[in-house]
């Protein structure tokens, strides 16, 4: 299992457009991919789940990836989060 904590830095938070890009990036991977806050957890392959987290600027979350392609999935998602300026 690979995990990393992130803090949302985008002033708009993770709203519909970046959430859909994260879901699109996560969906092809076989690994289980989850985002957890202190209060909630969501499957990163579910747009409704990600939107339900209501991640605003300053929110902290942890990315969990577990499965046969976890290394590739984790790298792709962590890179997308940072390159889009969503989280660090």
Curated annotation (Swiss-Prot):
Cross-referenced InterPro entries:
HPr, HPr-like, HPr-like_sf, PTS_HPr_His_P_site, PTS_HPr_Ser_P_site
Q: What is its main location?
A: cytoplasm
Q: What's one Pfam family here?
A: PTS-HPr
Where does the HPr domain lie? 1-88
Q: How is its activity regulated?
A: Phosphorylation on Ser-46 inhibits the phosphoryl transfer from enzyme I to HPr.
The cellular component terms of Gene Ontology attached to this UniProt record, alphabetical and capped at eight, are: cytoplasm
For whether the record's keyword set contains Transport, the answer is yes
Family statement: Belongs to the HPr family.
What is the protein name stated in its UniProt record? Phosphocarrier protein HPr
User: What is the organism field in this record?
Assistant: Lysinibacillus sphaericus
**Which gene underlies this protein?**
ptsH
């Amino acid at each position: 299992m690979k995990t990393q904590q992130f803090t949302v830095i985008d002033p708009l938070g993770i709203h519909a457009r970046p959430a859909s890009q994260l879901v699109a990036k996560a969906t092809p991977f076989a690994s289980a991919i989850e985002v957890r806050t202190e209060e909630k957890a969501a499957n990163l392959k579910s747009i409704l789940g990600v939107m339900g987290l209501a991640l605003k600027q300053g929110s902290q979350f942890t990315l969990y990836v577990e499965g046969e392609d976890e290394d590739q999935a984790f790298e792709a998602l962590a890179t997308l989060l940072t390159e889009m300026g969503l989280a660090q």
